Amino acid sequence: MKRQRIVIKIGSSSLTTKQGALDLEKLEGYVRAIVNLRKAGHEVILISSGAVAAGFSRLGYPVRPTTMAGKQAAAAVGQALLMQHYMERFHQHGIIAAQLLLTRKDFQNQTQYTNAYSALMELLKRGALPIINENDSTSIAELTFGDNDMLSALVSGLIHAHTLCILTDVNGLYDANPKTHPNAKRYQYLPTIPDEMLQMGGEAGSNVGTGGMKSKVAAAQTALSLGVDVFIGKASGEHALLDILSGKGDGTYVGNTGDLMEGKTKQWIRLHSPVSGVVRIDQGAERAIMNEGKSLLPAGVTSVHGTFQAGDVVHIWNEQNKVIAKGQVTLSSEQLRKVQGRKSDEAKQLIPLVRDEVVHRDQLVIQEKELNES
């Protein structure tokens, strides 16, 4: 089997008892399965939920708390306990486990995004096992990942994983909810995620998680767009993860992306970066960036809207005021207004240009379809 870089996402429902407490027997089973993956030569990154489940009983809650403050308090206690269990068990197999806590803000800020990438690459290089969870103690409702489902997809793209395994208590994707429709058909394989499946995914599943199939389907769609194949389903037994990689998993396989990986800079621009302004361009510039893969030059800019600095990200509009792309500018809005519509040689006479391009093609992502059809 070809050596792969694999992201394993374990949801709360797969790590807990019926009462919602952390199930150490289940955790031990996943540890053994991951150890076998590593022995087979694969690189593994673990995205693990379970901090709230591990901590709420220690604080005297009879059941999993439902308030944000309660969840954050339970996570503050539980994250340390969860990592302690993982580190002790992986240590028995000679594996160093490393903890990373992330929030959406870590993805939105380019410096923090790049730092997360560098840290993960160094850990893999050193043979450590990164264990990632959302920083539940500081996250707020608007910035959460949905039981780490979307977090696992974004991390998979960031580190150029070959496969994302989203493990849950349901054995795959169905054409209807199998809990309410006994004759629901399970999909063994899907080449893509149809839009209608996002609408029928349902809400949060068990009372110990925040994901549900809808968030898993959305995460799978994001991972596919980043060039990562996806498995959604169950994994029971120490050889379960190896079975998944060999095509014998108990769940649904999604996608066959091949080599469609997008670099981390373009991923950040497309998925995470805040937009600071708008640059409108003419038909010639639109054709150059859309059809010919070229950079945006000052000559193609017809107007500038908003206030931004060099290094900020802007939307690029065509003459019909449609968003066609998103890119990281090399000039401030003030500088760009001085040189818009000018050829590069003329622009250099007006302001000091570090580069000829307003937006280099390596910092530009086409977004016409995903933005204009929404």
From Swiss-Prot:
Disulfide links within the chain: none
Binding site for substrate: 49, 136, 148
Single Gene Ontology BP annotation: L-proline biosynthetic process
SUPFAM superfamilies noted in UniProt: Carbamate kinase-like, PUA domain-like
Top-rank EC class of the record's enzyme: transferase
Keyword Amino-acid biosynthesis (UniProt): yes
Keyword annotations: Amino-acid biosynthesis, ATP-binding, Cytoplasm, Kinase, Nucleotide-binding, Proline biosynthesis, Transferase
Positions annotated to bind ATP: 9, 168-169, 210-216
Gene of this entry: proB
Pathway note: Amino-acid biosynthesis; L-proline biosynthesis; L-glutamate 5-semialdehyde from L-glutamate: step 1/2
Assigned EC number: 2.7.2.11
PUA domain: residues covered: 276-354
The protein, known as: Glutamate 5-kinase
InterPro entries per UniProt: AceGlu_kinase-like_sf (IPR036393), Asp/Glu/Uridylate_kinase (IPR001048), G5K_ProB (IPR041739), Glu/AcGlu_kinase (IPR001057), Glu_5kinase (IPR011529), Glu_5kinase/COase_Synthase (IPR005715), Glutamate_5-kinase_CS (IPR019797), PUA (IPR002478)
UniProt-recorded Gene Ontology molecular function terms: ATP binding; glutamate 5-kinase activity; RNA binding
GO cellular component: a single term: cytosol
Signal peptide stretch: none
Biological role stated in the UniProt entry: Catalyzes the transfer of a phosphate group to glutamate to form L-glutamate 5-phosphate.
Protein family per UniProt: Belongs to the glutamate 5-kinase family.
Catalyzed reactions per annotation: L-glutamate + ATP = L-glutamyl 5-phosphate + ADP
Location of this chain's protein in the cell: Cytoplasm
